[in-house]
């Protein structure tokens, strides 16, 4: 697979390039801020950079007719509308977290929200001090899965890649569901899985849930 990376000089960009290359894929498009180096036409473009790069990413996908894997966080509704519009021209998969474990928890919460609808619920999340968006995209994914108004408690400390806990409580019991990211490598592996999955998909807007659904069938 020929792929491109937006933000290839960043921590995630370097890790994505390394992970994909180790699988035998070939990076043919390197993008970072005002720098663009293109060797060939990428079949898939991967963007885990900043939301400010979105317009550039969309233009490159259109120009090269490349499918897209995008894990950037902090998008507005307007940004998501831009991606919906792009999905009419290419296949794209968008998620605020490409960890398999996180996406499994989303599915669990989808099934629990009716059973625990009368329980109190709060989400606690911790990320590294350089993370700009608050609350995290992952916490918002969990909140959406719960389908009710939930308070999110956010902290930005040290170099923690990601730590999330959802608490459910009534007068006699406490249930906690937790996920801790030990290494950013899980995001790169998830992006690789998504890129290989979407390579030959028809135009459309996909999420990680579509990958899980296909694997469970």
UniProtKB/Swiss-Prot annotation:
GO terms for cellular component: cytosol. The keyword Amino-acid biosynthesis applies. GO terms for molecular function: 4-hydroxy-tetrahydrodipicolinate reductase; NAD binding; NADP binding; oxidoreductase activity, acting on CH or CH2 groups, NAD or NADP as acceptor. PANTHER family: 4-HYDROXY-TETRAHYDRODIPICOLINATE REDUCTASE 1, CHLOROPLASTIC-RELATED, DIHYDRODIPICOLINATE REDUCTASE. Keywords: Amino-acid biosynthesis, Cytoplasm, Diaminopimelate biosynthesis, Lysine biosynthesis, NAD, NADP, Oxidoreductase. Its EC number is 1.17.1.8. Catalyzes the conversion of 4-hydroxy-tetrahydrodipicolinate (HTPA) to tetrahydrodipicolinate. This is 4-hydroxy-tetrahydrodipicolinate reductase. It comes from Thermosipho melanesiensis (strain DSM 12029 / CIP 104789 / BI429). It catalyses: (S)-2,3,4,5-tetrahydrodipicolinate + NAD(+) + H2O = (2S,4S)-4-hydroxy-2,3,4,5-tetrahydrodipicolinate + NADH + H(+); (S)-2,3,4,5-tetrahydrodipicolinate + NADP(+) + H2O = (2S,4S)-4-hydroxy-2,3,4,5-tetrahydrodipicolinate + NADPH + H(+). Belongs to the DapB family. NAD(+) binds at residues 7-12, 71-73, 95-98. The active site is at 127 (proton donor/acceptor), 131 (proton donor). Pathway: Amino-acid biosynthesis; L-lysine biosynthesis via DAP pathway; (S)-tetrahydrodipicolinate from L-aspartate: step 4/4. One of its GO terms (biological process) is lysine biosynthetic process via diaminopimelate. Gene3D superfamilies: Dihydrodipicolinate Reductase, domain 2, NAD(P)-binding Rossmann-like Domain. Its main location: cytoplasm. (S)-2,3,4,5-tetrahydrodipicolinate binds at residues 128, 137-138. It comes from the Bacteria. It is found in: Cytoplasm. InterPro entries: DapB_C, DapB_N, DapB_N_CS, DHDPR_bac, NAD(P)-bd_dom_sf. Pfam families: DapB_C (PF05173), DapB_N (PF01113).
């Amino acid at each position: 697979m020929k792929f491109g990376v937006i933000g290839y000089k960043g921590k995630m960009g370097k890790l994505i390039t390394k992970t994909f290359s180790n699988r035998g894929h070939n990076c043919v498009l390197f993008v970072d801020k005002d720098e663009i180096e293109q060797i060939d036409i990428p079949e898939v473009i991967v963007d885990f950079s900043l939301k400010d790069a979105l317009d550039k990413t969309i233009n490159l996908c259109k120009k090269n007719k490349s499918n897209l894997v995008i894990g950037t966080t902090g998008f507005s509704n307007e940004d998501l509308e831009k991606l919906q519009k792009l999905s009419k021209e290419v296949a794209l998969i968008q998620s605020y977290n490409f960890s398999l474990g996180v996406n499994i928890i989303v599915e669990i919460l989808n099934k629990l929200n009716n059973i625990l609808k009368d329980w109190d619920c709060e989400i606690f999340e911790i990320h590294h001090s350089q993370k700009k968006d608050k609350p995290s995209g992952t916490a918002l994914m969990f909140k959406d899965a719960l389908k009710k108004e939930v308070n999110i408690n956010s902290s930005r400390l040290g170099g923690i890649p990601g730590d999330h806990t959802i608490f459910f409580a009534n007068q006699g019991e406490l249930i906690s569901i937790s996920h801790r990211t030990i290494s950013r490598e899980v995001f790169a592996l998830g992006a690789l899985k998504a890129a290989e999955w979407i390579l030959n998909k028809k135009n459309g807007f996909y999420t990680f849930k579509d990958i899980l659904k296909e694997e469970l069938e």
